[in-house]
Amino acid sequence: MFIGAFIVVACFIGVLFIYDYFVPMAGHKPAALEKKGQEVVSSKKAATAPKQKIQDKTSANKTLAKSSTKTFKIPANTEIPRLKEKRQEQVIKHEGYTVSYNSEYRIANWVAYELTATEAKSKKTERSNKFVPDPQVKGSTAMNEDYTRSGYDRGHLAPAGDMKWSAKAMRESFYLSNICPQKPKLNRGIWKDLEEQCRLWALDNGSLLIVTGPVITGDMKRLGKNRVAIPKAFYKVLCYHTEKGYKGIGFLFENRDYKDNSLKSMAIPIDSVEKATGIDFFPSIPDDQENEMEAAVDWSRWSF
């Protein structure tokens, strides 16, 4: 009986000891576990910190790009020139270009249009190759038969290659009001090279204003039944807008066969083209900007 009482007392003391040891610890993590937990939290912060910095940097770049990108909207009809001397003309607006047609000579005084980067890279429609009289022309006009076996190409002023963005613009580029007699090696050579270069400049600068045409003189020879005038020379003047204003360049080509001439060697100030043609180019640009742009070629702005 004494032994039994002893066992009961011993068990009771053991229970009290276990209770005193474990119960106070129930609301606390072991020190080692608390430290590990802190390390895990710290590791997560360390992992997310670089990600946050990258996000911040990306946002900053987007903001910088947005603020440093400028879009220059050229006023409508800035490309339209003005004849300095009295000359017969009928101004006709087509989808892709505007033409000043001279019925006395059956050719244009000038053709003007804006070529955007979107238009320059478009391949929406194929070349037409259907040369037809311009239905809007009043008075005498050239006909296809005038060019037959003449030794001259039907040379585009506004090229078909610039009109691939619209089926209508493509068709209208083959109107004979947009065509002049050109020597084959001019039309298919350096003139074509300049047309292709213009598309590259339009892509580089977002938009390019183009005015092109024949140099009209009173002693031009004629061809065909309708006595279409044969120009002695052709011109093309170009302009685009930057954060520093307008930049312009001109070209003048004799109507002859060319071999190895480079485009850069044929480039001249727009003022020189104005003197040769009797045309005031880009007259709607403020005079101070126009005069600066046309006086000299800023070679740093034209890549060849």
Regions found by a protein language model. Name each.
Residues M1-F304:
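Domain-level detector for secreted/extracellular nuclease and nuclease-toxin modules, and
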